[in-house]
Amino acid sequence: MTARAAGGSASRANEYADVPEMFRELVGLPAGSPEFQRHRDKIVQRCLPLADHIARRFEGRGEPRDDLIQVARVGLVNAAVRFDVKTGSDFVSFAVPTIMGEVRRHFRDNSWSVKVPRRLKELHLRLGTATADLSQRLGRAPSASELAAELGMDRAEVIEGLLAGSSYHTLSIDSGGGSDDDARAITDTLGDVDAGLDQIENREVLRPLLEALPERERTVLVLRFFDSMTQTQIAERVGISQMHVSRLLAKSLARLRDQLE
């Protein structure tokens, strides 16, 4: 992460520094009372820029901007309703995956254009919800193993679902996108469409392809998509440059795409 990117992330955190206190005040009100609802609405209103920021990251994918903003705001409302201040976690960290999950659900319901079985679509949706819940409890993005334990399923199934989701928008990591080059952001998981995995049908097809990748490419791919690491973190773990990580990711996805075509 560049110094400017770090500064951008810090400014975003400071932007919502008053939100934790707003939630503490909410807890002191009678649940379900008019005062409680008004105060929660105030929190939602306060965080609308967060939802709108996420919605803008998904522009240019065939959905009207106003629709994306509306869907993202619904996700924000859901996050405010579900957030448990007693966990001690940060609301923004919880809200981001919740909002993103709502937007992704919108795309799944309205514009999923690749050949992914319904079972995998539903699995990816469950993973989105579980990711939001675990992120709140853990204070960080969960690993594939933690998601598997949460959902009571095999880790291979979780990996399959994560890759199925990547089939319609491979996630970019260290770039905030657009002209705002200090917007790494709120999250490292927004990115552009990559059709490289659009013919994933089942794990029997995917597993041998992953195993056939060179060890370093497979390692980088697993760290990125299954362990939720950024390119910078992967570079530090593997001992190579961030640019090299980026090239390896592109190369490994290209290999998978060629094999799946």
From Swiss-Prot:
Chain intervals for the UniProt region annotation (Sigma-70 factor domain-2): 43-112
SUPFAM superfamilies: Sigma2 domain of RNA polymerase sigma factors (SSF88946), Sigma3 and sigma4 domains of RNA polymerase sigma factors (SSF88659)
Induction: Constitutively expressed at a low level under all conditions tested, including stationary phase and several stresses. 3-fold induced during starvation. Positively controls expression of its own operon (rsbW-sigF).
This protein's record includes keyword Magnesium: no
Region Sigma-70 factor domain-3, annotated ranges: 123-189
Record's keyword terms, sorted: DNA-binding, Sigma factor, Transcription, Transcription regulation
Region annotation (Sigma-70 factor domain-4) ranges: 209-258
Phenotype reported upon loss of the gene: Infected guinea pigs mutant and wild-type bacteria grow comparably. A double rsbW-sigF disruption shows no effect in the presence or absence of rifampicin.
Pfam families in the cross-refs: Sigma70_r2, Sigma70_r3, Sigma70_r4
Gene Ontology MF terms in the entry: DNA binding; RNA polymerase core enzyme binding; sigma factor activity
UniProt motif (Interaction with polymerase core subunit RpoC) ranges: 67-70
UniProt function note: Sigma factors are initiation factors that promote the attachment of RNA polymerase to specific initiation sites and are then released. Held in an inactive form by a cognate anti-sigma factor RsbW (UsfX) until released. Increased expression decreases growth rate, and after 3 days increases the expression of 51 loci encoding 33 protein-coding genes as well as some non-coding RNA.
Quaternary structure (record): Monomer. Interacts transiently with the RNA polymerase catalytic core formed by RpoA, RpoB, RpoC and RpoZ (2 alpha, 1 beta, 1 beta' and 1 omega subunit) to form the RNA polymerase holoenzyme that can initiate transcription. Interacts (via sigma-70 factor domain 4) with anti-sigma-F factor RsbW (UsfX) with a possible 2:1 RbsW:SigF stoichiometry, which inhibits SigF activity.
Protein name: RNA polymerase sigma factor SigF
Higher taxonomy: Bacteria, Bacillati, Actinomycetota, Actinomycetes, Mycobacteriales
Gene symbol of the encoding locus: sigF
